[in-house]
Design a protein with these regions (language model features):
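Short Gly/aromatic-enriched secondary-structure transition segments
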Residues: 47-57, 62-74, 367-386, 542-546
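Substrate-gating cap/lid region and adjacent catalytic-acid/histidine neighborhood
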Residues: 295-513, 597
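Acidic/polar loop patches that form or flank catalytic/metal-binding clefts of enzymes
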Residues: 287-289, 304-307, 458-463, 529-540
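Extracellular structured ligand-interaction cores
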Residues: 52, 105-109, 142, 350-351, ...
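Classical eukaryotic N-terminal signal peptides for Sec-dependent ER targeting/secretion
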Residues: 1-17
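Non-catalytic accessory segments of hydrolases
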Residues: 2-3, 19-200, 221, 362, ...
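Serine-hydrolase-like catalytic core of hydrolytic proteins
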Residues: 97-289, 293, 298, 342-369
């Protein structure tokens, strides 16, 4: 396979050599806003590719532009050196217990990686000859836009973590995006002063930039795939219900995150309450939204990000204090109704979708619980108080009936633990993992897939990633000692070289490299054609079938390079259990997600 790939590189080089505009080994690209001077990088298999880093896709959101929608980028004269990553958006990563606040408010930049650029105006702009248009479009590469995870409060599109080393062994253009995070990106007063969803609007602005400029990098603006993990995966899903995103992308991949998950949407009233809590802590008037926003625009970004400690009750729970929110209707609004209503009333964009989970998603939380002995004791002792808040059903379904809350909580305890105490033994640990996995990730994905096949004509491809590699993200989520299985985010290691930064002392095994071959092959093919397995190969020796039946959804199970199989009814008994809980909560809670009976 590698010999064939090397031959492909040689052929591609011969095709593209006449299209490059290279100065002293560095590529030049002309965009609508100005000329870029890029750099070169090498892929895992030794391919030389072109990188343009720190490209502005919006004006810096500073001063009066803080808490405002992104504005068009400012054009520049001369040549902009796009050879280094821009600053990351200001943040503090509570998931790894980061102490310092890092980054900058001037952060709306993206990176573009390409195997071949079309550098001149003549090469980038199609003429009016239909045959030449067809040939040039065919020669362009599919585009993949990456939205990072991190709970909409941490992360970045930087090359050190989400670089092209693995994916650019295939013929595609990769775009990675920074967007505003935490209260700077997701605070909302639930009115027109600060309606919210700024981070999602940043993403949409980046998508517009790609649509207008990606041809200059050899990309096909009519073959764009959004993909993301965790909050990035949920972001992709949100763009699928936004009519302003229509036409800017053509396929979506949501890894370990979609808007059915309970941490992805703020209940009415709560977003405003948190905005007021933040403002009051910083000495701002909370009499009205206008005064609050004007006051917060005068505060430092560090002060605003530093309020994250105000909202923590059990570790970093409740999960993600500043999230997407339903906005009042106005021009440019990103979300004006519960996205579940959008899906069930036919307003989800009908594009191919790929989604799935890792086998132990809940390790993202449970490693932090078991990494500190007092947390395990607290969970056992105060289960009735912690679980409704931490699993988010108290907020999501606005449970005001104490008897109902206690009944649901007791049902959860009995299902996962029976009469056993929650302690340090392995059985207990993995049951806590299952509980968080199902509540935060698995059940929402199960519901999303079922609704998709009922309401859409495009295919949905469902997967279960159960490959245990050389190292796990659980080691940085709070416990470097114990085993938690295949953690949330573990799949990232086989699409991007994140491990080189996060786990520098771990060398990828031969099996890890085979998993990179598998994952990049599947992701590339989906981006290229909408079919993740167009043919049976040695790398993936079967066809991945889309989901056809809601009563027993088909899915691809990835365990190792020799065990990739089709199966159905993923975690079925656990999903039936959560179906019953959700039904009870929606029937008896005061939920804003209390949808029509027929839904």
């Amino acid at each position: 396979m590698r010999e064939c790939r090397n031959n492909m590189f040689i052929q591609l080089g011969l095709i593209c050599i006449f299209a490059f505009n290279v100065v002293c080994g560095n590529p030049i690209a002309k965009t609508l806003n100005g000329t870029l001077y890029g750099t070169t990088m090498s892929t895992r298999l030794g391919r030389s590719i072109y990188a343009f880093l720190g490209i502005p896709y919006a004006a810096p959101p500073l001063q009066k532009l803080r808490f405002k929608p992104p504005q068009s980028p400012i054009a520049w004269n001369g040549t902009l050196h796009a050879t280094a990553n821009a600053e990351i958006c200001m943040q503090r990563n509570i998931y790894v217990d980061q102490k310092e606040i890092v980054g900058s408010e001037d952060c709306l930049y993206l990176n573009v990686y390409t195997p071949c650029i079309q550098c001149t105006e003549e090469q980038s702009n199609l003429n009016h000859d239909p045959e030449q248009q067809r040939q040039k479009a065919f020669a362009r590469f599919p585009v993949m836009i990456w939205f990072h995870g991190g709970g909409w409060l941490a992360g970045a599109g930087h090359s050190e973590y989400y670089g092209p080393k693995f994916l650019l062994d295939f013929d595609l253009v990769l775009v990675t995006v920074n967007f505003r995070l935490g209260p700077l990106g997701f605070m909302s007063t639930e009115d027109l002063e600060c309606p919210g969803n700024l981070g999602l609007k940043d993403q949409q602005q980046a998508m517009r930039w790609v649509h207008e400029n990606i041809a200059y990098f050899g990309g096909d603006s009519n073959r764009v795939t959004l993909f993301g993990e965790s909050a990035g995966g949920a972001s992709v899903h949100y763009h699928m219900v936004n009519p302003l995103s229509a036409g800017l992308f053509h396929r979506g991949i949501s890894q370990s995150g979609n808007f059915y998950n309970p941490w992805t949407l703020t209940s009415p009233g709560i977003a405003r309450m948190r905005a007021m809590t933040l403002g009051k802590h910083l000495g701002c008037s909370t009499e009205n939204s206008k005064d609050l926003i004007e006051c917060l625009q005068m505060k430092s970004a560090e002060e605003i990000i530093g309020t994250d400690q105000l909202f923590k009750k059990f570790g970093y729970c409740p999960m993600i204090p500043f999230r997407p929110v339903i906005e009042p209707e106005h021009p440019g609004a990103f979300l004006i109704e519960d996205p579940l209503i959008s899906v069930r009333e036919g307003r989800l964009l009908d594009v191919p979708w790929m989604t799935g989970v890792t086998s132990e998603e809940g390790a993202i939380k449970v490693a932090g619980i078991y990494g500190r002995e007092q947390n395990v004791k607290e969970l056992e002792t105060n289960f009735d108080k912690i679980v409704p808040m931490s699993l988010l059903y108290d907020e999501r379904y606005n449970v005001t009936n104490e008897d109902l809350r206690n009944e649901i909580t007791a049902t959860i305890r009995n299902f996962y633990f029976g009469y056993n105490v929650i302690d340090y033994n392995e059985y207990s640990r993995f049951k806590v993992v299952d509980m968080y996995s199902d509540s935060w990730f698995n059940h929402g994905t199960h519901e999303a897939v079922q609704d998709f096949i009922v309401n859409q004509t495009s295919p949905v491809f469902y997967y279960y990633f159960a490959y245990k590699g050389s190292i796990s993200f659980s080691t940085i989520f709070g416990d470097p000692v114990r085993d938690y299985g295949v953690s949330h985010a573990d799949d990232l290691q086989y699409l991007f070289p994140v491990g080189e930064q996060l786990f520098p002392n771990t060398t990828l095994s031969e099996e890890d490299h085979k998993m990179i071959d598998i994952m990049t092959y599947i992701w590339y093919n989906f981006a290229n054609s909408g079919n993740p397995t167009p043919k049976v190969t040695k790398v993936v020796p079967l066809k991945w079938k889309p989901v056809k039946t809601s009563s027993a959804p088909e899915y691809l199970r990835i365990e190792n390079s020799k065990k990739i199989t089709m199966d159905h009814s993923l975690l079925w008994q656990r999903m039936i259990f959560w179906d019953s809980l959700t039904h009870r909560l929606m029937n008896h809670g005061n939920t804003f997600r209390h949808l029509k009976d027929e839904l």
